[in-house]
Amino acid sequence: IVASLVGSEMCIRDRLVCWPPHISAPIHGHEGEKCWARVQTGELKICNYVEINRDPLSLEKIQEFECPPGFLDGPADIHSVENLSDSFATSLHIYAKPYEECELFDTERGTVTKAKMDYHSIDSVLCNK
C-alpha cells in the first residue's frame, strides 16, 4: 500500500492511497477521529465495525460495501479496506484531525496494537525510506 499525505492542517488531514491488486489494510481505527473515504479508481471493499469490548476484544461488522469509483464512505471510526480487483485502485481519505498513529485490531489474536502512519510522500516530496 502506497500512501501520500496531500494536505494537513490543524483540523483536517488528506491522504491519497494507492492499492495494489488484491491487497488489504487490516481492521484499524483513527485515534477516535472520523474518516471519510472516497474511491477514486478501481473497486474496493470497505467494512465498518463497532467495538463491543476491548478485553477480550470483540468487534461487530456493521456494514460491508463493494465500492466502485465515486463511492463515499463515512464517517467511519473502525474499518478495513481491500482492493478486490486485478488492477490498482486509489482512494482519498479525509480525517477530522491529524494523527500520527492508528490502532490495529487483530480479531484472531484478540489484540489491539498501535502503528505509526507511514507515507510514500508528503506534499509531493518523497519520504526517505
Q: What is each residue range found by the language model?
A:
Residues 1-7, 11-12:
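Single conserved hydrophobic/aromatic residue that forms the stacking wall/gate
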Residues 15-30, 74-76:
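Conserved short histidine dyad/triad with adjacent acidic residue
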Residues 21, 32-51:
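Glycine- and acidic-residue-biased ligand/ion/polar-headgroup-sensing regions
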Residues 24-26, 45, 69-70, 76-81, ...:
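Histidine-centered metal-chelating micro-motifs
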Residues 29-31, 84-85:
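Short glycine/proline-enriched turns and hinge-like loops at secondary-structure junctions
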Residues 36, 51-79, 116-120:
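Short acidic-glycine-tyrosine-enriched beta hairpin
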Residues 74-94, 98:
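Ligand-binding loop in jelly-roll beta-barrel domains
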Residues 110-129:
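Long hydrophobic alpha-helical segments typical of transmembrane helices together
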